[in-house]
Amino acid sequence: MNFVPHQYQQYCMNRIVQDPAVGLFLDMGLGKTIITLSAINELKYGRFQVKKVLIIAPKKVAEATWQREAAKWDNVSHLRISTVLGSTSKRIRALHTPADVYIINRENVVWLVDYYKNDWPFDMVVADEMSSFKNHRAKRFKALAAIRSHITRLVGLTGTPSPNGLSDLWSQVYLLDQGERLGKYFTHFRERYFEPGRRCREVVYSYDPKEGAEKAIMDAISDICVSMKSEDYLELPEIVYHDIPVALSAKAQRDYNELEKKMVLDLGDDHVLDVTSAAALSNILQQLANGAVYTDDGGWQEIHNDKIEAFIELIEQLNGKHAIVFYNFRHDLDRLIVALQKTNLHVRQLQTSVDELDWNAGKVDVLLAHPASTAYGLNLQDGGNHVIWFGLNWSLELYQQANKRLHRQGQKNRVIVHQLICEGTRDEDLARALLMKDAAQQYVMDSLKARVDKYRRQQ
């Protein structure tokens, strides 16, 4: 596919190419990945200014997102990518595989720095989700800071760099400029811009920004950080679709394939796939992709948690921005609630008018809803502008109407629809079907028949 950058994307690409260190503060779904890959390509093959690039990302992003995006666009499809994940031996093998770009998950940054020590080979580093380094006491921050002088170029990507307050900015900016703008020590930064807040005698529990601190900090970092507001994206459509590929683990993929094969073959060799049997089979395959299936006793059994992990990473990357999450099955809801309990977010299931009012009043961080319960009549545009589809629905009408709960008159920001798509599963069929609009239902049937035929031929 040919990549024609929007004006703001071209500006960001130019900043990466021209500046040795830059932080890009852009909403998810606005193209940070292709912006960065295009800049990497220009620096490596257009200007010959970088040799080896390291991308540090959340685990599920490291597994699939960058690889899928590189394969999608013609201008960067030639970039060789090595994924540094798995056991120690697999990671070492990946590091010694010839490539242009190496991708590692943030949990292994400490290991990577220790592995190379002073023989650090990456002259360009991209921190995808820079806020992962917001804690100046964390080992991963200290590890990256220790080898910062060996890095010629550093790019920090995030949607919201300071989800918990201005103090989060120090460590991220330090990695960019090694203390030039906000100081070389966190204590000095805090003394300059903050004053003690909640305290008990000599013990200070929190610090509050001094008057004018926010403006002073933003002015200090404005030359090294690109922060864009919604008005900067005026050229974009009012609704943006953001597909997030989810790579299943090897075991999860095997389990999915075996269960899919069993379900298909249980139909029998001479069974004609009609609407009823197709709906039942598609329903089960959708459950498998989401990570759980109903059991005969009315309960459910978890098959994998890869999509749940990707969902939590997505929530983390939103950095407190409110989102409505659409689920399909009861076990989706149960698993989402359990996963979200580990966060400090205010989570609510959409059940009554009170939930609707609280969402629109900004009192709810994550609103869990079934698309059928929001199809008509609800106005949810005041509570946020992010939609997350944990599992897609084959009904184009339900899909469009659910998205319109936020994408409607009164919405002050562009709506971004995030869709979690498990690779190699029924998810991919549904995503393609929804793009076909009027032909969606026929494609749902055709794609299912293709899966059935594949397994029957293998017998």
PLM regions with names:
Residues P237-L248:
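Short amphipathic
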